[in-house]
Amino acid sequence: CWSRDGKFLAFEIKRGANQHVTVMPAAGGPTTQLTTERGLSWPYSWSPDDDKIAFAGYRNDLWNIYWISRSTKEQKQLTNYNKLNAFVRYPEWDPSGKRIIYEYSESVGNIWLMDLK
């Protein structure tokens, strides 16, 4: 996904059985892997300040929503789902940066809006 200012791209890169959030300058150049945890990390959208990337992460057999900072690599888990057959995807920041909307489903898709504190 493109950063809002168009200067960076975020994408997942496969390393063995794992997929990690990775960024690179849109004009080309070296890539920077941001996540290191085992599992899947699927980046989807940038925060309004173009520093954080919201992504769906599959870790320890569970899907949750996270963000990670491009500049510091600080990471935060935003949801705490614990059902094995559920999934989350498509996290998108609102223009103010105060909320994230995403899909959560145990069997049929539902749209959730989360306030960030």
Q: What do these predicted regions represent?
A:
Residues C1-E12, T36-A56, K83-E103:
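Conserved beta-propeller blade repeats
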Residues D5, A17, A27-P30, D49, ...:
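Cysteine-rich, disulfide-stabilized extracellular repeat modules
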Residues A17, G28, L40, D61, ...:
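Exposed loop/turn and edge beta-strand positions of beta-sandwich/beta-sheet ligand-binding modules
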Residues A17-T22, D61-Y66, V108-M114:
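Structural motif
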Residues P25-G29, S69-K73, L116-K117:
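Short loop/turn segments that connect beta-strands within beta-propeller blades
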Residues P30-T35, K76-N80:
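A short beta-strand motif characteristic of beta-propeller blades
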Residues G97-I100, S107, W112-K117:
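Gram-negative outer-membrane assembly/targeting C-terminal domains
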